[in-house]
Amino acid sequence: MEWTREGETLSPGSPREPDSLRAFRPWVLEDESGALRMWYSGHDGTTWRILEAVQRRGEGWSRLGVAMGAGFAGESDAYGVHSPCVVKTPGGYLMAYAGFDGEADRLHMATSSEGHEWVAHGTIMQRGDEDAVGASHPCLVMTGERWWLFFSGYDGQQNGRRATVLAAVSPSGASWDRLGTVLEPDGDELAASHPCVLEIARTLYMFYASDDGTHVSIALATSTDGISWERLGTTLGPSGEGPDGLSAHAPCALRLNDGSIRMWYSGLPVGDTDLAYRICSARFPGPWSS
């Protein structure tokens, strides 16, 4: 599976901007006009916020500023918000995101009629042993039968760096039943995290971050039931140079209206010591098959 890298989409912002240190974990939707809307995590060296950007046809990306700030839902996200996942619903937009309360990340939900002004709905699900020290990086998937929620769980092992992909299901998106871990670190992996799942022809494709402790690559797995996954290995690794020379992280894959597949992700250049991630993109040029 060969991707065509398109380079850097959004660099860290200017000094004093909310993404001046890093721009991370993008989530992209395409609207009816063909415009691309992005929500992403921005960090200024102190606080995570959720930011918004747009790319209209024939234009570059334009930053739209802060979509959601720390304390949006109250005490449960008072110290920062990040890792948005946005889906279109009949009533507007639904966002799942991570909020930090000063001790641990917890999953939250918010709704919006147009995707700009959001209404907080607080936390969802109690944490378990698999995400005892943090639940983050949610991915919402609506199938014909149910809603799925995939997310990263941190159990505190390996100095807090070990992560697994967990899943939950819901008939409507209002209440969730935990299914537990569906993808664990394998072999030399320290963490499997940051899931992004697409449903194509009744098959689920999970793009996720595979962390070996030194570099992060984007890996791919497939499933027909959402619970048992077949690993297909790395689909996009660090390039060795340029904006993603050291790491390719936190993917968001999107099937566009024309049927093609694009992916936005967080890149880290070789020599970076500040974790100054920037948002990059790649395109899958051929017919889609695993």
Question: Language-model segments: which ranges?
Answer:
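Conserved active-site neighborhood of enzyme catalytic/cofactor-binding cores
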Residues: 252
